[in-house]
């Protein structure tokens, strides 16, 4: 359900004080509310962003208010690349390209080109919405992509897909990712129990660019067996993921009271980035854990590692979701 005010567009659940000023456009545009049983989610026009997700009225993600815009990539889609591109420069099929540097302090391009674009909703229903955006050629990325994101609430939780189709006449470099922050309670991540089935992590330099791989065994980054996060600061890319028998990789997060969230992803995402939200403002610092499924590692436009050469007419798709079965009382 997409909600509009008398002279503007507002979200479901907006307090009456905001409704009185309905002419004020939400910074994230039209709000698409999904409902299924005790679950509610909001996907925004700007960026096809997952702004909110609650179960029984309790937040399952660290989202943001309808009066705000997404900061620190909260709930955003990362296309046509996730993570950073060092100096914003890359070479593709013998041609050098320069991307906009939107992480100026580290001189990087970061998290793609569509986070602030207006996406169009197609055939929305009570519990599902499909968002579409046509990425046209531009300086630094002269390729045309048809991008589609679906969000659906089901009994077990949120199910989502993300795909890109190359509408250009030449191969296009392509990667994809998503950036939800899980939140199992209103406290800091320090007391949460985390399990990440990954054997390897990326080491990074001072600009957060990869400089090599390292085994997680015996380090503070080893969460192959569930353990409390404690004071560990995470801004870490993991790979060599271990799948369950059904082919899915699952990251679990459990609060001290036993409530548990599980983020799952399919084999289309051989990478996960975990980020403990340390740079966020003091009232939000470490109150959510970003678990980011990605088709390729950071800086893949330069390294080529797991970068998809999307052929003309070809589609690449990833699936992911949040299982809330253990989140209810």
Question: Where are the regions a protein language model picked out?
Answer:
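Acidic-aromatic substrate-binding/catalytic surfaces of carbohydrate-active enzymes
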Residues: 40-98, 102
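A short, structured loop/turn motif at beta-sheet edges
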Residues: 91-95, 121-129, 152-157, 186, ...
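Extended, loop-rich substrate-binding clefts of extracytoplasmic carbohydrate-active enzymes
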Residues: 9, 101-155
